[in-house]
Amino acid sequence: MGRTPTAVQVKSFTKQGQQRRVCRDLPLKNTKNGLSPGMRTCFLYLRFFPCLSWMSLKWTQAVHCARNIVLSFMLLLLLLNYNM
């Protein structure tokens, strides 16, 4: 039986692969406040994607992590509404 990878392993794997790809693929549009929506979304991914990967392994122990993701999602919605 294979061992489940630790959160640290998932985090480092995610940092090297997924986040970079997400950042590169986002369209970079300029907005009046300087930071493009693509970059802002990218920052959220950098912060919370490792958290999501870890949750998929240890979802029963990740309640505080889930709360952070919900808060960030609400913040993202606010930012999108602000930019409309």
UniProtKB/Swiss-Prot annotation:
Highest taxon, organism lineage: Eukaryota
This protein's name: Putative protein BCE-1
